[in-house]
Amino acid sequence: MGQEQGTPWIQSTGHISTQKGEDGQKTPKLEHRNSTQLMGHYQKTMNQVVMPKQIVY
């Protein structure tokens, strides 16, 4: 699937674009996964921080 679509891109831009596209596809996939985990961690931390802050107040 990706190779068929990459064929015209390679002829149009060059193999450099193909490498960049592959790298870009890998980066967002990892970032998306990290973003979700980070968000969950952030929410947990925020909840823990907000709870004691409210009690202190």
Swiss-Prot record:
Polar residues: bias regions: 1-19
Residue spans of biased composition, Basic and acidic residues class: 20-34
Subcellular location: Host nucleus; Host cytoplasm, Host cytosol
Stretches for region Disordered: 1-35
Origin superkingdom: Viruses
Alphabetized UniProt keyword annotations: Host cytoplasm, Host nucleus
Coiled coil spans: none
Pfam families: PB1-F2
Signal peptide residues on this chain, from the entry's feature table: none
GO cellular component, one term: host cell nucleus
Main location as per UniProt: host cell
GO biological process per UniProt: symbiont-mediated suppression of host cytoplasmic pattern recognition receptor signaling pathway via inhibition of MAVS activity
Family per record: Belongs to the influenza viruses PB1-F2 family.
Remarks, miscellaneous: Is not encoded in all strains, and seems to be dispensable for replication.
Role: May play an important role in promoting lung pathology in both primary viral infection and secondary bacterial infection.
Protein name listed in UniProt: Protein PB1-F2
Species this chain originates from: Influenza A virus (strain A/Chile/1/1983 H1N1)
Gene field: PB1
